[in-house]
Amino acid sequence: MAPRSVLETIQSVLQKNMVREFLAEFLSTYVMMVFGLGSVAHMVLGENSGSYLGVNLGFGFGVTMGVHVAGGISGAHMNAAVTFTNCALGRMTWKKFPVYVLGQFLGSFSAAATTYLIFYGAINHFAGGDLLVTGSKATANIFATYLPEYMTLWRGFLDEAFVTGMLQLCLFAITDKKNSPALQGTEPLVIGILVTVLGVSLGMNSGYAINPSRDLPPRLFTFIAGWGKQVFRAGNNWWWVPVVAPLLGAYLGGIVYLGLIHPSIPQDPQRLENFTARDQKVTASYKNAASANISGSVPLEHF
């Protein structure tokens, strides 16, 4: 028997579900973060090139594109808090948690590096070559969130937990087939709109990281790239809040929806029959797609 070629070996590895899900989370998070961080760079560095609304649209539609990239493979969580909640509530196995989060962290870190390279000249010009974490010429806030002076650490914690809870509650609602889910095929757009709405309504106080995978890897990049230890010390050691608070908030938001709303949905037989018929059609279409070597699993319900 002839030895397997390198290409065949790579294809064999990529066919494993865990590997595919890792790569899906990596690429979807990378796409989301490039659009999101790029929009922040425009607001910080360009006098008239960006705005706060632009940042929210950048992250919102970045999420939409990320779900389009990987929604049919991993569900495109792009958020360690969402992954944690799905594992904690039994909607996916814990063995997938490190795979998803590692993919998200590496994708986010890579996006931060990409953003730095794209805006390298503008970053150096903006602060005269200095890499500052605080002050009017700060550029570290392009990559991670920092607490404003009027906010205390614990108020920021509650803010992050609450906004992430709203995110998770609405994600469960959007993908709940027994309630009023988004129309089939519109889920990426609706989820992106959700992120945009959270930003324009609740994002001012803490920068609405609402995602450990969005905040910690870029912060680590800035530490390595020259901004130094101040990226962890600023804001009374704010760095850990966008990591811990979203985990708690998403979990509580998930419990609120599954505990209060999901059991209260009327089990109308005709409605359930309609959902079953729709699901059978969707399953059949994905089986046909699979025969054409296209992935047929769309686990968006993991949200």
Swiss-Prot record:
Extracellular side: 40-52, 118-152, 203-206, 221-238
Spans traversing the lipid bilayer: 22-39, 53-70, 97-117, 153-173, 186-202, 239-260
Annotated site location: Important for permeability to glycerol: Y120
PTM comment, free text: Phosphorylation by PKA could prevent the interaction with PLIN1.
UniProt topology in membrane: Multi-pass membrane protein
Cytoplasmic side: 1-21, 71-74, 89-96, 174-185, 261-303
Free-text note on domains in this protein's UniProt record: Aquaporins contain two tandem repeats each containing three membrane-spanning domains and a pore-forming loop with the signature motif Asn-Pro/Ala-Ala/Ser (NPA).
Identification of the protein by name: Aquaporin-7
Organism: Mus musculus
